[in-house]
Every structure is written in structure tokens, then in C-alpha cells.
């Protein structure tokens, strides 16, 4: 086929390599034309020009040019602050038939900084209109990322942002429900730390919703073994602090003693700071004393009795 090359775009149906048409020069020219049209207050004409080019790049398997066209289309809408056009362009380009993975990912990653402040906060806004647009953009990007493995990280971030927005509006139940939609433990592209942090947020909001049955289920997704690893101390403390809330509701003194002892025994962040380890050890002793007699309670009692820090605790009156 004249004017075509076999590129790195992968195999098409039937195992044949897709043919790639190099549209880089045409893309350079038409992007420049589109920018000039926008400078002349002709956004619709610029988007129409780029839409036709987007199809040629997509059908011609020129992914590099396709990504540039998609990014430019969104950027031009943002440049003139046409929020309606931006949302529509985003939706249209992301849902094109046989749209390339690279294009969808580029669209989402281009738009996210306009509604997200790293790492998981909604974009700071000064007007209600800006706030409403950011909320719409977060929802649109979440919808686009739904079910796409290559956008797992982005979907997790967007979900955290949406939950934060709802929590700030005072709707804890809705915030908890939003986070529960994402089974982050199955996301292969997220690090262990990212997964644990997300699950801890699920726990916090579920407890805030006072759904203790769900909170227990979510807590079961956290590997205690992972919490013992290096650089996980912060998450270990957060986890067992949340568990104290759960076990207080459950009125389980022995589990509370174990929770506080897990906090107390965290190296670095707790054991090196008397202001932190002393309250944790004191709570351990109190709840252990309130625990019903049993083998586990007695074993833990003997272990605590041999701790030299016990002598540093103030007497309880």
C-alpha cells in the first residue's frame, strides 16, 4: 500500500500487522490552523477540523499524531474556557468506535489536572461555577475510566477526589458508597502502599457511616503481614487506630488491647517518641485489665509485664 508503513501499533484481527499511515506533517499543519481559528474566536470550526483529522489518524493507526490531536482538542477548549465544549469533546473522542488506548489515556491524563490537585484533592476553585465544572469533569473522567485496566490508577485517584467532594459537602454515606464501588485490591497497576491507603480511606468513611459490618469486611482486605514491612509504619498506625473505633463499638476489650499494643510496638514513629508510645501502652494495659480471663489474655499479660517501659507509666487513680 503506497504511503504506508508497518508501525508498532500491534496486531490487527486475524494476526496481521496493522498498517500505519504517517500523518505527522498533516497533523502539524492542521493543529496550527486550529490554533489560528481559535485565536479568531472560531472554536467550533477548529474542533471540526481536528475531528476530521482525528478520524484519519485513528483509522490510519498513527497513534502519535492521534494523541496530539486529542490533547490539542481539549487544550483549545480549555484555552477559551468553554466548559461545555470541553466536556462534549472529551466524551466524544474517548468513546469513538475502536478508539486507541493511547488516545483515551492521553485524554484522561490531559484533563485530570484541571479537576484534581495531587494527590487526591479536588481542584481548588474560587467560584461556584468553577466548582460545578470540576465536579462534572471528575464524574466524566470516572465514567471514561470505568472498566479500563490501563486507567486503574487514574480511576482510583478520581474516585478518591469524588469521595472527598461528597464528604466536604457533609454526605459521609455517599462518600463511603463511592469508595466502595472500587475494588482496589484487584488493581494490578497500583503499588501495595496505594492499595492500603485506599482501603484505609474505605474503612474510615465506612466507620464514619457507622456501617460496622461493612467496616469489618473492608478491614479484612488489609494484610497484617504487609503492615509489618518497612516504610508501612504510618499505615499500620492508621489501620489499628481505625480498628480501635470498630472494637470500641463492639465493646471488645481484648481486641482493643491488641490494637493499642500494635500501635505501641511500631518502631520509629511510636517507640522513639514517648508522647506517642506512653498513651498507647497505657491503653493496652487498661483494656487488657478489662478483658475476660483466658489463655490469650494471660499470654499477653505476661508479655506486657516483661516490658521495661511499663515502669514509666503513671499510676492510674
Label the predicted regions.
Residues 1-317:
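Extended alpha-helical scaffold regions
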Amino acid at each position: 500500500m503506497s504511503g504506508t508503513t508497518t508501525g508498532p501499533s500491534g496486531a490487527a484481527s486475524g494476526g496481521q500487522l496493522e498498517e500505519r499511515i504517517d500523518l505527522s506533517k498533516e497533523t502539524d499543519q492542521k493543529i496550527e490552523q486550529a490554533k489560528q481559528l481559535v485565536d479568531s474566536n472560531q472554536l467550533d470550526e477548529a474542533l471540526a477540523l481536528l475531528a476530521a483529522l482525528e478520524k484519519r489518524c485513528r483509522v490510519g493507526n498513527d497513534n502519535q499524531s492521534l494523541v496530539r490531536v486529542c490533547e490539542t482538542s481539549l487544550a483549545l477548549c480549555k484555552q477559551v474556557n468553554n466548559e461545555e465544549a470541553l466536556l462534549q469533546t472529551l466524551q466524544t473522542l474517548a468513546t469513538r468506535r475502536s478508539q486507541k488506548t493511547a488516545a483515551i489515556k492521553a485524554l484522561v491524563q490531559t484533563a485530570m489536572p484541571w479537576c484534581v490537585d495531587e494527590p487526591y484533592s479536588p481542584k481548588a476553585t474560587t467560584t461556584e461555577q468553577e466548582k460545578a465544572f470540576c465536579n462534572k469533569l471528575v464524574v466524566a473522567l470516572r465514567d471514561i475510566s470505568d472498566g479500563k485496566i490501563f486507567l486503574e490508577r487514574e480511576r482510583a485517584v478520581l474516585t478518591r477526589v469524588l469521595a472527598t467532594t461528597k464528604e466536604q459537602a457533609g454526605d459521609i454515606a455517599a462518600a463511603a458508597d463511592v469508595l466502595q464501588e472500587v475494588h482496589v485490591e484487584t488493581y494490578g497497576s497500583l503499588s501495595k502502599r496505594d492499595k492500603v491507603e485506599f482501603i484505609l480511606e474505605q474503612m474510615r468513611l465506612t466507620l464514619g457511616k457507622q456501617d460496622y459490618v461493612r467496616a469489618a469486611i473492608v478491614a479484612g482486605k488489609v494484610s497484617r503481614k504487609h503492615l509489618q514491612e518497612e516504610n508501612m509504619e504510618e499505615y499500620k498506625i492508621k489501620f489499628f487506630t481505625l480498628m480501635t473505633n470498630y472494637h470500641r463499638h463492639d465493646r471488645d476489650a481484648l481486641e482493643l488491647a491488641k490494637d493499642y499494643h500494635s500501635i505501641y510496638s511500631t518502631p520509629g514513629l511510636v517507640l522513639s517518641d514517648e508522647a506517642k508510645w506512653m498513651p498507647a501502652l497505657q491503653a493496652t494495659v487498661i483494656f487488657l485489665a478489662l478483658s475476660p480471663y483466658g489463655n490469650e489474655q494471660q499470654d499477653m499479660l505476661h508479655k506486657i509485664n516483661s516490658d521495661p517501659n511499663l515502669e514509666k507509666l503513671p499510676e492510674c487513680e
